[in-house]
Amino acid sequence: MSDQVKIPRATLKRLPLYYRFVSSLKSKGIDRVNSKAISDALQIDSATIRRDFSYFGELGKKGYGYNIDSLLDFFKSELSESDMIKIAIVGVGNLGKALLTYNFSIHDDMTITEAFDVKEDVIGQKIGNVIVKDNDELITTLKKEEIDVVILTTPERVAQKVADELVQAGVKGILNFTPGRINTPSDVQVHQIDLGIELQSLLFFMKNYSE
């Protein structure tokens, strides 16, 4: 990624969408795609797609579109998916167990390798391919395994305390499923997942944009 151009956050958040769609085209044997096809599939206007791609140099040619293999190579490099990304989950309640069972089954380059909880009846359980560890081992394990991405699914009342421990362990990215906002240093990225807001957004788009 260019060091001279600051990429908008909205563009960066769309990269995984583009990557997943282009990967699906590759699996179907398609070797090129244009911005209109991407637009129709992802419901993102073509101008936005072209602008997003323009931040990263010449990814396509006018009249030809984008080469699938070239796009995949580019997205993998930008998303740091050339190597396996190890992820930890903290809080193994119903949602945590569901995420462990799913464990990014459609993403070959990401996997949850560690899980932590405080409940004695959960610690030691094997869920999917992961054995749940005592939360007392959190900081030590994250440092040892060099894990810098964590999914947070704890109760809201302890979310900030756990977040502070994650920062202490060197974590740089937190996907926060707890209802409360957490405070972290500026170099730690937090993405808040509020299912209520996501559903409201979905209903809005269904009402206003469905044909």
From Swiss-Prot:
InterPro entries: CoA-bd, NAD(P)-bd_dom_sf, Rex_DNA-bd_C_dom, Tscrpt_rep_Rex, WH-like_DNA-bd_sf, WH_DNA-bd_sf. Transmembrane segments: none annotated. One of its GO terms (biological process) is response to redox state. Its main location: cytoplasm. It comes from the Bacteria. NAD(+) binds at G91, V92, G93, N94, L95, G96. It is found in: Cytoplasm. GO terms for cellular component: cytoplasm. HAMAP family: Rex (MF_01131). This is Redox-sensing transcriptional repressor Rex. The lineage of its organism: Bacteria, Bacillati, Bacillota, Bacilli, Bacillales. The gene is rex.
